[in-house]
């Protein structure tokens, strides 16, 4: 065999090996989930599954179920509280013009299909002031994410609003965008967690939230 022939054979063998290695590497990163399961994961990221659909993922694909949100009623938790901050009286003696200030807090927690797994918790705080006649001040809300699961990506703030309306009530709302990813596939959906508040004259606070 001539030197040229040996070189050609060696090159062919090298190319074949490279091709085989590339094919093997591609197989390693290929999704192990059937197409219908990926479709079910996308559905879970957009809204509530039926109990049968959720149970299938939990029993057959527990690693996948751990990274998917559970939007079925009663599966997420929330908590709210108001912390007294300070009281300041103005120059008038009337009780209805006494200004008080507090900080309201609300946390919205999203859990996965695996009940014990928290995907994230978003807590929002708003400092506000009022008297008996009107809300006098609402600061922009400030939020913090805790217990963020590895397949949840906090992409950024969508809106941050604080205002007082014509009825002298205060309002605040904070919303974020979170990407929901699953192994081997990537992003299958996005949630938009938010906390919102309404502040009444006299200091009453109403709050709500969602994803």
Task: Describe every region a protein language model picked out.
Residues 92-211:
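Mature secreted bioactive peptide module from preproproteins
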């Amino acid at each position: 065999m001539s030197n040229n022939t040996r070189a050609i054979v060696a090159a062919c063998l090298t190319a074949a090996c490279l091709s085989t290695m590339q094919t093997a590497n591609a197989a390693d990163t290929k999704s192990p989930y059937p197409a219908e399961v990926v479709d079910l994961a996308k559905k879970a990221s957009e809204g509530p599954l039926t109990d049968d659909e959720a149970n299938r993922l939990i029993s057959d694909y527990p690693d996948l179920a751990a990274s998917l949100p559970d939007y079925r009623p009663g599966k997420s938790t929330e908590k709210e509280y108001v912390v007294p901050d300070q009281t300041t009286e103005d120059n008038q003696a009337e009780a209805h013009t006494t200004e008080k200030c507090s900080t309201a807090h609300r946390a919205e927690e999203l859990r996965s299909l695996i009940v014990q797994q928290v995907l994230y918790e978003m807590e929002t705080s708003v400092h506000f002031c009022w008297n008996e006649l009107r809300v006098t001040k609402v600061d922009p809300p400030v939020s913090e994410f805790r217990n963020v699961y590895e397949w949840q990506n906090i992409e950024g703030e969508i809106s941050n609003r604080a205002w007082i309306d014509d009825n002298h009530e205060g309002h605040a709302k904070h919303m974020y965008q979170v990407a929901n990813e699953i192994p081997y596939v990537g992003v299958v959906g996005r949630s938009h967690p938010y906390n919102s508040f309404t502040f009444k004259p006299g200091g009453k606070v109403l709050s709500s939230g969602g994803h």
